[in-house]
Curated annotation (Swiss-Prot):
Residues 45-59, 1430-1450 have a biased composition (Acidic residues). The gene is pds5. Keywords: Cell cycle, Cell division, Coiled coil, Mitosis, Nucleus. Its main location: nucleus. Residues 1-145, 680-707, 1340-1450 are annotated as: Disordered. Residues 1402-1427 have a biased composition (Basic residues). Residues 1369-1378 have a biased composition (Basic and acidic residues). It comes from Dictyostelium discoideum. This is Sister chromatid cohesion protein PDS5 homolog. PANTHER family: ANDROGEN INDUCED INHIBITOR OF PROLIFERATION AS3 / PDS5-RELATED, PRECOCIOUS DISSOCIATION OF SISTERS 5, ISOFORM A.
């Protein structure tokens, strides 16, 4: 005890200057410091206290209680005081160097943590306030002291005080005399012990100390407390008596709740004296067994409310005094403190007892640190029996080392709470925690992960804890890949709250979270999305493209909820970054690389899942774009987004708007029928009865009556039309939901849907309607989902009519034009300037114009009020004029032009038909026809005929002008031929005077001779307007291409087809054949000339008179055109030929035999094959759908054979067998087998298709070639086809069976034997066994696998790039697999689209490489930029959309 006192005196002397708090017990550390002060106190072995303290210091001792409370309850103030470091573990720390808020345990929820924090803060504030008030109260008490209004005690009686306080006195007198004694002792100065010997004996008498009357015991305690004050620093009693005295003191301290209000002043003064002189510092010395029970009793009486605040403060002071005096902290005391520390109310909120204990330990944290280290060793030590098995004692609550078993179970909670108090508390346990993190038991790993996640999430200590043991932090981060989902969830919660000043550590955590984007559990993937969003919004510069890649990929997740969260999260992130850094153009390169692709990613999802489409629209409309009332800003942001969209995503966005348009049209048609079923349901147009004969009028009336008698059938048609455009909803059929919508009970919702479908409804009104409808569809029924889908699909959200005003303003601003003056229309011809027209736009075509063009193709009616503004742009550069003409051509039906503006527009369009650009001239002519037809024609009121004399005169003048330019040898040949071709196609009569001139020009001067006419070299348009070919042509080739197109239009538009017309067609074929011998043109020019001729002939063959006259050789030439390959990969001209062929066939303008041309494209690149498969599938499905709706008698008719897709197989086999390389392909026939396999794959889907093709092959084996009767090539090809058919479909186990088609081989191509007219199935099987013409040891070459039912091509051999693409996809999917500790953790969360809440058969997934090709159509090599401008013009004119080619009328 002496050594301990010496150390204490020395340390107090060191810290006295800093704290200004004198201590009663001073410890000695070294001998030199003993001589520094005469006030050093030592405790002798016999327990006496020595002191030289002056009486002047008594006031300081009395203030110590108040100062102590202020230090404990106001740690923020004590932090400002400089303190010296204390190295002696037993030395108590009067003040705390760091102040930390009370934190709940690891088991509390975030809301509970918040409540706990607030409760702790409120308690601290209350205690701080109370501390100051208690200080002032104590000062007053010190000055006045307690007076009992009694006569002073007679001092002489002290000598015989034992007799004076004899047991014969009544309780009232005893109390009265004790009060007098207390008052006397209060006035007695410290150290004046004269006459108190007998008093001491009396006070320790059991009749007073153990009296049943509380007031007697209280007054005895008051007197004893004053005795201790007077005798300080010596002890007035020996150890035996002290036990009795301390028993009385502890009993009185714990009776605070029972003290009467009248006695509270005496009670509080007693506690104050005990606190000031720190009597309870002797408790451990007097009786250590009383220590833990006293702590337990005090802690159990803590209330934590305002009413009991003084007592809570007193308990805190007493317990602090005891802790400061301890040489070592017993295990039982740690048990009690820690049990109180982790005590929680229901819901996990810390109790007032836990908060009190937290503050108690925090105040003495530095002193308790070493003692806790020793306790921690026992706490973490596992209990082992002699046999090596874990001890399990059910009969005892304590373990071998005295630690509570409950504490051992909650060691992780203890570690976290102690870490909150002082991080150094848990440093000795870090190694054990690292072992626990790698334990086999998942619950142990989870417990360690929880406590460390809480610790590392502490902002003030995370960096220090990481640096303390880096290996522990690395092991902890590895738990992101734990097998147990609960542990991975804990780690995700940690990453959400993790904060650090180190960017490196933050990046490590983000990478770990990124790996969880491919977690097997959707909830963890959702959590990873939320965490990324939080970090990005907080600091976007933390991101890099590598981290963002998986984040963006979540919009393609297989789980619908994950996709939904990803779409909303990405939209929120993009908006946050834009609000912080401004428009995308102002972003840094890093931000652009990371976040500019977000709109692209969202738009790309429009092509994946049906249930995501309207969510993407909501994300755009409500998050990416500003508020609906700010239309100007919405327009600017939309332009900004559209600028950074890839070309493929722009097309996807356009396609989605077209889907919305289709649904809106069908929905409004249904509504119109409901309003007026007689007009709409009858589907008849009113006609004049005077112009119809009586019989026809009667028939029409009967038809209308029949239709009106069946309104239900009519409405079913409209419902079906709407249903065809809806996805599938879970629980109900979409058709039933449409019927439910049109019931009277849903009339309000229906009216709102009609209103939101109106193009004039503003964005704000649309938003209000959406809110109104969605508020009525809060449940999760199918009808609610259907209503939500409809309200978003029918609305003109994202972009609509309101945007046009600001888009046109922005376009005028970009072009530097003056503001539009509606009251002062301009004369376009006067404003037109050729220099301005020929001048290219400096920065290319503005994105504003591109958006306007896209909108005109989808919503042509939104331009109705802006016609005068649009035509004003026709005086700008040719790069601007071309898209403006497209807009006018798309929206001409809805534009409202004044008469003066219309006349000026027609004059301007005629002027543009003579510009040097053929594409622009042709578009100007077609636009002129659209505007001029209603303006220059009228209906005669007398006979009802159309009077188009004005239009004919105008067109004749145009034709005369064009031929005059030819005579004058104008350098505008290409445009003149283009416009003449348009005139010849639709209005051949206006060229009647110039037919001979045209024949001479086309046949004699251009096609078969040398043309002396020339054209201007500067004819190209801006590259962003036209997708021209990246080729180089000679001038003669360019002229011939223009002539071929003009000739095809001329032949198509002729009223009467004569022998001369057929000769012109044959001349084109001869020119086609002669190209192979031509030495003037290079290989590319020859190939492209052939393709142009094929396109022209396909256009001509729409007239059946031409098509019927072609020979088998000519048919072969047409089909072989699709097999032409050039050095250009994916030649756009080949694609255009395929698209032209598909167009005329789907419109049934060419017979099915031309399907053979699709099969001859088998050797083309993969992108071309995909296009072929797409168009051929569309044609075949259309034909089969028509056949399925025909009556059985009609479908079996012989004249319908040519309508079946399978009827093209004989023609295709003929083309394959007459290839020049067919015989050279022997004996393996690899190329021939490739062609046959590809075409068979296109046609065969089911068993009946298989049987039809099988029958055709067997019949062909018995036929003879009509051209070369000795040739057996077609039989060899048929045998190849049979082997392919058997090999590729052997898993289907199909066999030849009866089919609904009569096989008729074309007589021009094959000679048919009479015995084949009625061949049975047995005959077909027999014909297979005929002697084969294939080599004896022939083996079928390796062939690509067939496509599946979803039309997904599994071709592995068609193109080498396909294998590369699949390998890259596999590498990308498996990129992060090796980072995980478990096998089931990473299971391809990005899957092929499947059905979700709203589901339909998924769209075909495009490979990454193919998507990349679609996204970069503008990339061109610099080596070929020097091509002639005229070449670009001709090729671009060929690529323009030919929707107007359907106008074949005269």
């Amino acid at each position: 005890m002496a050594t301990r006192a010496t150390r204490a005196a020395s340390e107090v002397a060191k810290t006295k200057a800093a704290t200004n708090l004198p201590s009663i017990r001073k410890r000695k550390s070294i001998e030199n410091e003993e001589e520094e002060s005469k006030h050093n106190t030592s405790i002798n072995d016999d327990g006496e206290l020595d002191s030289d303290i002056d009486e002047e210091d008594e006031s300081k001792f009395e203030k110590e209680f108040t100062v102590k409370k202020r230090q404990k309850k106001s740690p923020a103030k004590t932090q400002q005081q400089p303190q010296k470091s204390i190295t002696t573990p037993t030395k108590p720390t009067p003040t705390k160097t760091t102040s930390k808020p009370t934190k709940p345990s690891a088991t509390t929820s975030p809301s509970q943590q918040k409540q706990s924090s607030q409760s702790s803060q409120n308690t601290s504030k209350k205690q701080a306030t109370s501390s100051s008030s208690q200080q002032s109260t104590q000062q007053k008490k010190k000055e006045t002291k307690i007076k009992y209004n009694l006569k002073p005690i007679n001092i002489e009686r002290l000598a015989t005080y034992d007799q004076h306080m004899s047991g014969t006195l009544s309780n009232e007198k005893i109390i009265k005399r004790l009060k007098k004694l207390d008052e006397y002792l209060q006035d007695k100065k410290r150290g004046n012990t004269e006459g108190l010997e007998i008093v001491l004996e009396v006070l320790i008498d059991p009749k007073f100390a153990d009296n049943k009357i509380f007031e007697i015991r209280l007054m005895t305690s008051c007197c004893l407390s004053e005795i201790f004050r007077i005798y300080a620093p010596t002890l007035p009693f020996d150890m035996v008596v002290l036990k009795v005295v301390f028993k009385l003191f502890t009993e009185q301290v714990l009776q605070g709740d029972k003290v009467d209000k009248k006695l509270f002043p005496q009670y509080f003064q007693m506690l104050e004296r005990l606190s000031v002189i720190k009597v309870f510092a002797l408790l451990a010395l007097v009786d250590s067994s009383m220590l833990t029970p006293f702590f337990k009793d005090c802690l159990s009486r803590v209330h934590g409310d305002k009413e009991h605040q003084p007592m809570d403060i007193m308990f805190s002071t007493l317990l602090n005094t005891i802790l400061e005096s301890l040489e070592e902290v017993p295990t039982s005391l740690w048990n009690e403190l820690l049990e109180s520390l982790i005590e929680r109310e229901k819901g996990g909120v810390p109790t007032s007892k836990a908060i009190f204990t937290h503050d108690l330990i925090e105040t003495n944290s530095r002193f308790l640190q070493v003692h806790f280290d020793l306790f921690l060793q026992d706490l973490l030590e596992p209990e082992i029996l002699a046999g090596g098995q874990q001890q399990q004692q059910q009969d005892s609550s304590l373990s071998n080392n005295g630690i509570s078993k409950q504490l051992k179970k909650k060691k992780n909670e203890i570690l976290f709470e102690m870490f909150n108090i002082l991080p150094e508390f848990i440093y000795p346990a870090l190694q054990n925690l690292e072992f626990d993190l790698e334990d086999v038991n998942a619950s142990i790993r989870k417990g360690a992960a929880i406590v460390l996640s809480r610790c590392y999430s502490t902002e003030s200590a995370s960096d220090e804890l990481i640096a303390q043991r880096p290996t522990l932090y690395t092991t902890f981060l590895n738990r992101f890949h734990d097998v147990d989902i609960k542990i991975r969830t804990v780690m995700m919660e940690f990453s959400e709250h993790f904060t650090t000043t180190s960017d490196l550590e933050m990046e490590r955590v983000l990478k770990s979270v990124r790996d969880r984007f491919r977690d097997s559990e959707p909830d963890i993937r959702i959590k990873a999305i939320q965490i990324f969003q939080k970090y990005i919004i907080k600091n976007p510069e933390l991101m890099n493209p590598e981290l963002m890649s998986e984040y963006l990929e979540r919009v393609r997740d297989k789980d619908s909820k994950v996709r939904k969260d990803a779409e909303i999260s990405l939209s929120t992130v993009w908006r946050s970054v834009r609000e912080k850094y401004g428009p995308i153009d102002d972003w840094s390169n890093t931000l652009i690389d990371c976040f500019s692709t977000i709109p692209n990613t969202l738009i790309h999802c429009l092509g994946l899942y049906d249930d995501d489409k309207y969510r993407i629209e909501i994300a755009f409309d409500s998050i990416l774009l500003p508020q609906h009332s700010d239309v100007k800003n919405r327009s600017q942001v939309f332009l900004e987004i559209y600028k950074y969209l890839d070309e493929s995503n722009k097309q996807l966005f356009k396609k989605y708007l077209e889907e919305k348009k289709s649904l809106r049209q069908e929905f409004l048609a249904l509504i119109q029928f409901l309003k007026n079923p007689k007009v709409v349901g009858g589907s008849t147009t009113p006609t004049s009865k005077k112009s119809q004969p009586p019989q026809q009028q009667q028939q029409q009336q009967q038809q209308q009556q029949q239709q009106l008698q069946q309104p239900e059938n009519d409405i079913e048609v409209y419902i079906t039309h709407v249903d065809n455009l809806l996805p599938k909803f879970i629980g109900e059929s979409s058709k039933k939901l449409v019927r439910q919508l049109i019931t009277p009970s849903n009339k309000k919702i229906l009216d709102l849907l009609v209103l939101i479908s109106d193009i004039n409804t503003t964005f704000q009104e649309q938003y209000n309607i959406k809110i109104s409808i969605i508020s009525k569809a809060q449940n999760e029924s199918s009808f609610s989902e259907f209503i939500k889908y409809m309200v978003n699909k029918l609305a003109y959200s994202i972009v609509g009519k309101e945007n046009i005003k600001y888009l046109l303003r922005g376009l005028r601003s970009d072009l530097g034009l003056d503001n539009f003056d509606k009251n002062n229309p301009i004369d376009l011809l006067e404003e037109f300037n050729e220099k301005i027209y020929e001048k290219e736009v400096k920065d290319g075509v503005p994105e504003t114009l591109e958006v306007l063009l896209m909108l005109s193709q989808v919503y042509a009616n939104i331009f109705d009020d802006y016609g005068d503004q649009l035509v004003g742009f026709l005086t700008c550069s040719k790069s601007i004029v071309y898209p403006v003409l497209q807009i006018l051509s798309n929206s001409w039906k809805t534009l409202k032009l004044s008469k003066k503006t219309l006349k000026s527009t027609l004059d301007m369009l005629l002027r543009l038909t003579q510009v040097p650009q053929p594409t622009l001239a042709r578009l100007a002519f077609k636009t002129f026809i659209k505007f001029a037809t209603p303006a220059l024609t009228s209906i005669n009121s007398t006979n009802g005929k159309v009077d188009n004399n004005k239009l004919v005169v105008t067109l004749k003048d145009l034709a005369n002008n064009l031929f005059d330019q030819l005579e004058d040898k104008s350098k505008n040949l290409l445009s003149i031929l283009e416009v003449i071709g348009c005139l010849a196609k639709g209005y051949s009569l206006v060229l009647s005077e110039h037919l001979d001139t045209l024949d001479i020009l086309l046949i004699k001067k251009i096609m078969t001779g040398v043309c002396t006419l020339d054209f201007n070299q500067k004819v190209q348009l801006n590259k962003s307007v036209e997708h021209h070919l990246n080729t180089s042509y000679s001038k003669d080739v360019l002229i011939k291409i223009a002539a071929i197109k003009c000739m095809s239009n001329y032949l198509l538009g002729l009223r009467e087809i004569t022998k001369k017309s057929h000769e012109m067609v044959n001349m084109l074929f001869e020119f086609y054949i002669g190209l192979d011998k031509n030495k003037t043109y290079n290989d590319l020019e020859k190939s492209h000339l052939k393709i142009h001729i094929a396109i022209g002939l396909l256009r001509v063959f729409q007239r059946s008179q031409y098509e019927k006259e072609i020979t088998p050789q000519q048919f072969i030439l047409i089909c072989n055109s699709t097999s032409i390959t050039t050095k250009q990969r994916g030649d756009p001209l080949i694609r255009r030929l395929i698209e032209k062929l598909a167009k005329v066939m789907i419109l049934n303008r060419l017979p099915m035999k031309y399907m053979a041309a699709f099969g001859m494209a088998a050797q083309q690149p993969y992108s071309v094959l995909a296009l072929v498969r797409k168009h051929s599938t569309s044609i075949i499905k259309t034909r089969r759908m028509v056949i399925s709706r025909l009556a059985a008698s009609l479908s079996m008719a012989k004249n319908l054979t040519e309508f079946y897709p399978e009827s093209s197989m004989p023609y295709f086999l003929y083309v394959v067998s007459h290839r020049e390389d067919f015989e050279r392909d022997a004996p393996d026939y690899i190329e021939s087998a490739c062609y046959l396999n590809f075409f068979i794959d296109l046609l065969v889907e089911e068993a009946d298709n298989y049987s039809i093709i099988h029958t055709i092959f067997t019949k062909l084996k018995r036929s003879t070639d009509a051209l070369d009767k000795k040739s057996k090539n077609h039989i060899i090809a048929a045998e190849l086809g049979l082997q392919i058919l058997t090999h590729q479909y052997q898993q289907k186990k199909w066999k030849p069976q009866k089919h609904p088609i009569v096989i008729v081989l074309p007589e021009k191509f094959y000679i048919i034997h009479d015995d084949q007219d009625e061949m049975s199935i047995d005959d077909e099987v027999t014909s297979i066994k005929l002697p084969s013409l294939l080599p004896k040891r022939f083996k079928l070459p390796p062939l690509p696998s067939i496509t599946d039912q979803n039309n997904n091509n599994n071709n592995n051999n068609t193109n080498s790039t396909n294998n590369d693409e699949s390998e890259k996809d596999e590498n990308n999917n498996n990129k992060n697999d090796n980072d995980n500790d478990n096998d089931n953790d990473d299971n391809s969360t990005t899957a092929v689209p499947q059905k979700s809440i709203i589901s339909k058969p998924p769209a075909k997934k495009v490979s990454k490489k193919a998507a990349a090709k679609q996204k970069s159509p503008k990339k061109k090599t610099n080596k070929k930029k020097k091509q002639s401008s005229s070449e670009e013009e001709v090729s671009s004119s060929e690529e323009e959309d030919e929707s107007q080619d359907e106008e074949v009328e005269n």
